[in-house]
Amino acid sequence: MGEMEQLRQEAEQLKKQIADARKACADTTLAELVSGLEVVGRVQMRTRRTLRGHLAKIYAMHWATDSKLLVSASQDGKLIVWDTYTTNKVHAIPLRSSWVMTCAYAPSGNFVACGGLDNMCSIYSLKSREGNVKVSRELSAHTGYLSCCRFLDDNNIVTSSGDTTCALWDIETGQQKTVFVGHTGDCMSLAVSPDFKLFISGACDASAKLWDVREGTCRQTFTGHESDINAICFFPNGEAICTGSDDASCRLFDLRADQELTAYSDESIICGITSVAFSLSGRLLFAGYDDFNCNIWDSMKGERVGILSGHDNRVSCLGVTADGMAVATGSWDSFLKVWN
């Protein structure tokens, strides 16, 4: 028997051990657990604001921690910081590369970041002495496009890339502190845990991974999707994650039980998911789809309880405010809408 065959058998045995361990953790099912829960009822939300100003597809958005400002990135080569109360543009930042795929707001409100097919993460200071917004750093070491970025604080940012890696950067020095290797397909999205100690990534290898920021190691891997994972987010308490995929489903994975709890899908939905976000309580899951809609799911019962339909093209990004009072959707129709 060849060495390869031996290793293959060993791998299969290990897989079986993992499956058994997961079964032992599954002392109940989510459906059993929530059978006594009140039904959410129909969730109806209205468009409260429409943010007009981009001249092309919007690819990404991210709320500031004040639940008032948000940043959006568009194919028109602009990064716009909006005041969602008044719909005024606080900053319109022309980008060096218009092929932007992601943007992020720093928790402090001092910086925004973006990146895309230029393989770089550009950091912009919003609080410069001169009052104008300027590039404070360009972080380049990825060998593929930048798919997502999220600040940990004003000096640390995590990025995911088409080169299959994620990276933690020291913004001051412009250097990568840690490279997170393990995915076997383009890394499409990432999300940081509520305590900023962990982050999760979703990739075109159809897996999601949980990483330890300080140790630089992969703690857990979650499989089950049948196609690329485009979007990922943490449950508000940080103990579960949700993924959205081109296989037309979202899935909920529990970190402690190390397995999938439920999937959110419907026979009538046949298109991919671009973006996912939970309500503040975690009871509602918002998911943006290629069919121009945003579906609202009861995360516990797995039923669709509402739909946000106001866009004339793909919903490319969405986000819930830190105070839980509003959800914003961004679309290829060039508009952002704020709902509640």
UniProtKB/Swiss-Prot annotation:
<comment type="subunit">
    <text>G proteins are composed of 3 units, alpha, beta and gamma. Interacts with RASD2.</text>
</comment>
<comment type="similarity">
    <text>Belongs to the WD repeat G protein beta family.</text>
</comment>
<keyword id="KW-0853">WD repeat</keyword>
<dbReference type="GO" id="GO:0007186">
    <property type="term" value="P:G protein-coupled receptor signaling pathway"/>
</dbReference>
<feature type="repeat" description="WD 5">
    <location>
        <begin position="224"/>
        <end position="254"/>
    </location>
</feature>
<feature type="repeat" description="WD 3">
    <location>
        <begin position="141"/>
        <end position="170"/>
    </location>
</feature>
<dbReference type="InterPro" id="IPR001632">
    <property type="entry name" value="Gprotein_B"/>
</dbReference>
<keyword id="KW-0677">Repeat</keyword>
<comment type="function">
    <text>Guanine nucleotide-binding proteins (G proteins) are involved as a modulator or transducer in various transmembrane signaling systems. The beta and gamma chains are required for the GTPase activity, for replacement of GDP by GTP, and for G protein-effector interaction.</text>
</comment>
<dbReference type="GO" id="GO:0030159">
    <property type="term" value="F:signaling receptor complex adaptor activity"/>
</dbReference>
<dbReference type="InterPro" id="IPR001680">
    <property type="entry name" value="WD40_rpt"/>
</dbReference>
<dbReference type="Pfam" id="PF25391">
    <property type="entry name" value="WD40_Gbeta"/>
</dbReference>
<feature type="repeat" description="WD 1">
    <location>
        <begin position="53"/>
        <end position="83"/>
    </location>
</feature>
<dbReference type="GO" id="GO:0005737">
    <property type="term" value="C:cytoplasm"/>
</dbReference>
<protein>
    <recommendedName>
        <fullName>Guanine nucleotide-binding protein G(I)/G(S)/G(T) subunit beta-3</fullName>
    </recommendedName>
</protein>
<dbReference type="InterPro" id="IPR020472">
    <property type="entry name" value="G-protein_beta_WD-40_rep"/>
</dbReference>
<dbReference type="GO" id="GO:0048471">
    <property type="term" value="C:perinuclear region of cytoplasm"/>
</dbReference>
<dbReference type="InterPro" id="IPR036322">
    <property type="entry name" value="WD40_repeat_dom_sf"/>
</dbReference>
<dbReference type="InterPro" id="IPR015943">
    <property type="entry name" value="WD40/YVTN_repeat-like_dom_sf"/>
</dbReference>
<dbReference type="InterPro" id="IPR016346">
    <property type="entry name" value="Guanine_nucleotide-bd_bsu"/>
</dbReference>
<dbReference type="GO" id="GO:0005834">
    <property type="term" value="C:heterotrimeric G-protein complex"/>
</dbReference>
<feature type="repeat" description="WD 7">
    <location>
        <begin position="310"/>
        <end position="340"/>
    </location>
</feature>
<feature type="repeat" description="WD 6">
    <location>
        <begin position="268"/>
        <end position="298"/>
    </location>
</feature>
<feature type="repeat" description="WD 4">
    <location>
        <begin position="182"/>
        <end position="212"/>
    </location>
</feature>
<keyword id="KW-0963">Cytoplasm</keyword>
<feature type="repeat" description="WD 2">
    <location>
        <begin position="95"/>
        <end position="125"/>
    </location>
</feature>
<keyword id="KW-0807">Transducer</keyword>
<dbReference type="InterPro" id="IPR019775">
    <property type="entry name" value="WD40_repeat_CS"/>
</dbReference>
